[in-house]
């Protein structure tokens, strides 16, 4: 039993290190946002291609026991939480919560985003006009 406790203690130490590293990452991201705001009038700096390149680099170099798909989800949530340090993304989507649109928005933008449901296509576009959301997720046929 002592061996299991030793392993758990090591996991706890790693968890503590992960929290410190995630917080350090957040601090650096805030600094990047401050630098970007000096150069741009934009108040939001979501850069999807940067996120894609990070996910590609991390999954390519992993070599560990976690499947790449799991790493993608972990990093999606880190990106979402990091963006929320500035201001959460506001994602408009068609339908109530738990619909396919809502689930797709969570998968793409993470749980730290703010999700704004709309009952019809007209109201979802009105959200953009009123600046109530920064991104729309609509079904394209």
Predicted feature residues:
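Domain-level signature for soluble enzymes in the chorismate/prephenate branch of the shikimate pathway
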Residues: 1-141
């Amino acid at each position: 039993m002592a061996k299991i406790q030793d392993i758990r203690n090591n996991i706890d130490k790693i968890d503590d290190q992960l929290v410190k590293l995630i917080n350090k990452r957040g601090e650096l991201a805030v600094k990047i946002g401050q630098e970007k705001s000096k150069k741009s009038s934009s108040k939001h700096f979501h850069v999807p291609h940067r996120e894609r390149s990070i996910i590609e680099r991390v999954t390519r170099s992993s070599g560990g026991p976690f499947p790449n798909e799991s790493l993608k989800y972990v990093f999606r949530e880190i990106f979402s939480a990091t963006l929320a340090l500035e201001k959460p993304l506001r994602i408009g989507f068609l339908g109530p919560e738990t619909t396919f649109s809502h689930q797709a928005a969570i998968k793409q933008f993470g749980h730290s985003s703010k999700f704004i449901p709309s009952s019809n296509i007209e109201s979802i576009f009105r959200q953009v006009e009123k600046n109530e959301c920064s991104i729309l997720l609509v079904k394209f046929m």
